[in-house]
Amino acid sequence: MGREFIPLFENWANSYDDTVVGRDLQYKEVFRDYDGILDDVVSRSGHKVLEFGVGTGNLTAKLLAAGKAVTGVEPSKAMREIAEAKLPENAVIVDGDFIDFPDPPFSPDTIVSSYAFHHLTNEEKREAVKRYGKMLGKHGKIVFADTVFKNREAFSAAVKKAKENGFLQLAEDLETEHYPTISEMETIFTSEHFSIAFQKHNDFVWVMEAAKL
């Protein structure tokens, strides 16, 4: 369920916010236009939002500032502690992951995530989307920002470029986690009765908006 990556995020928690502002050259392109990406997710969201992979709370903060009701789900204790320290007292962050999580205190009209869905295998992604489809009403939305590739050739080219640039940590990340292609994401969502559209933000990250049919 992506929880195998918790040790990575326990170690990354204290430096994550430095990474997203571009201080780690290996991930500078991954996080280019980070604020704009999060703002795009917020602008596509409804009023009652369930967020997965809260991390240090950057997207959560923007959702709350926009007046949304938000329940956040985050499996890493270290990340939750940082998020809770920076967010308003009324912020609700619970332990859980994309598939195993407590019911939120409201019926969400939007489910969001940023930089996290790739922790799930494609089979787990479909399992998660199936569950979300049961939670959302007609026209309910899933809005995810994450690294996605046009095709497997584009993925291979990204790994090759990372290695040529000496970005070995980035290359290992790409080869270890479960980064999908656009067609794979289309299949996952349409098979669970969602329409889906993609907006590219940088060489890695796209914002995906799926609506329940």
Swiss-Prot record:
Keywords associated with the record: Methyltransferase, S-adenosyl-L-methionine, Transferase
Q: Name one GO molecular function term.
A: rRNA (adenine-N6,N6-)-dimethyltransferase activity
Listed Pfam families:
Methyltransf_25
State the SUPFAM superfamilies in the record: S-adenosyl-L-methionine-dependent methyltransferases (SSF53335)
The Enzyme Commission number assigned here is 2.1.1.-
Q: Where does S-adenosyl-L-methionine bind?
A: 53, 74, 97
Q: Which protein family is it in?
A: Belongs to the methyltransferase superfamily. YrrT family.
Q: What does this protein do?
A: Could be a S-adenosyl-L-methionine-dependent methyltransferase.
The protein here is known as Uncharacterized methyltransferase BLi02856/BL02021
Q: What is the lineage of its organism?
A: Bacteria, Bacillati, Bacillota, Bacilli, Bacillales
